[in-house]
């Protein structure tokens, strides 16, 4: 354990990564990335609005926990080198780093009881934002919350008229026409 090893090397930095952390009510439970993606709420907000919660097809929780752990170890090494050579023990669960990705959704739920729903490739704060099939049967991803990229997109699809139309000039106005925007681009 860390306390034993620290006696031999006071500068030791040790990282633990587990499903639910080293302490707490779930600490003894086995944990894998898929469970973390569900437990964190990530799967609940991913997928199409009328579909089931969707898990990523790649090890998202594992990768995010690895990046978080790497950052934590680097920060602990930096602190150790500046604060007298004393190491640290770091505890990261697979699910907690995913909470930072769900950010406002978690806060909206815990503070206001608002449950976020699945939105597919859309975002309630930006339009156009989606994936669209092209005429040559390929797919493109578009995200134009800022007005200038949206105007360039409208020009690219032959809808220059929208670049001077106040109903399409700002993201706020475009959000009133999400379905129309998607249908026009698709």
Report the location of each language-model feature.
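Active-site-adjacent "lid/gating" segments in soluble enzymes
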Residues: 1-145
């Amino acid at each position: 354990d860390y306390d034993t090893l620290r006696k031999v090397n006071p500068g030791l930095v040790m990282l633990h990564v587990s499903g639910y952390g080293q302490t707490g009510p779930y600490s003894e439970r086995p944990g894998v990335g898929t469970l973390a993606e569900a437990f964190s709420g990530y799967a609940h907000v991913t997928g199409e609005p009328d579909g089931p919660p969707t898990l990523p097809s790649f090890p998202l929780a594992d990768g995010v926990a690895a990046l978080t752990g790497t950052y934590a170890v680097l920060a602990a090494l930096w602190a150790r080198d500046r604060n007298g050579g004393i190491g640290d023990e770091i505890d990261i669960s697979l699910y907690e780093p995913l909470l930072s990705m769900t950010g406002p959704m978690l806060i909206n739920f815990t503070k206001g009881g608002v449950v976020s729903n699945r939105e597919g490739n859309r975002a309630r704060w930006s339009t156009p934002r989606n994936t669209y099939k092209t005429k040559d049967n390929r797919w493109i991803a578009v995200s134009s919350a800022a007005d200038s990229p949206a105007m360039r997109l409208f020009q690219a699809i032959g809808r220059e008229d929208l670049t001077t139309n106040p109903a399409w000039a700002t993201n706020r106005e475009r959000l009133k026409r999400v379905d129309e925007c998607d249908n026009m681009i698709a």
